[in-house]
């Protein structure tokens, strides 16, 4: 059992024990046992739901892993934004976002995003993944943890905002490049 499941069962068990108006210890035990079994089933179901990756996230990873920059741009609303926090760059609209993907492909060989977990909350999805590739001209490839916060439109069909968070210092260190390295401008 995970600590999350144990914590949920402990809280529900304590709540059932405190709220129980059962006249005997046996009745209280029966209520607590039933509540614990129900809580365990609910926690297990919630964990199974967390393992399902939302369709838009699968499409997002497929677009990053593919070679067609417009596939990434097409996932966004017309005025959507893509922010790469590590390089302090924001792109607006499908054309700029597609251009960012094309630039990334020209600088990084074998760009790949591997989804580890997702967490949905309303129109927001937090994606934990591994961002990997090989900066062109670098002696070694990199693979760093990345967290992406994706905000969806009200229909959950398109991305309104995407913010990637990863360590550029770690990318450069793993790649064998100096900390002040900058990509070529052409």
Where do the language-model regions lie?
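A beta-strand edge to alpha-helix "cap/lid" segment located at domain peripheries
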Residues: 12, 17, 38, 99-186
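Soluble or luminal CAZymes and related metallo-dependent hydrolases
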Residues: 52, 96, 142
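A solvent-exposed, acidic/Ser-Thr-rich amphipathic alpha-helical stretch
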Residues: 69-121
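Alpha-helix C-capping/helix-to-loop hinge sites
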Residues: 60-63, 83, 134
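Short, low-complexity N-terminal intrinsically disordered segments enriched in polar/charged residues
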Residues: 2-6, 10-74, 180-186
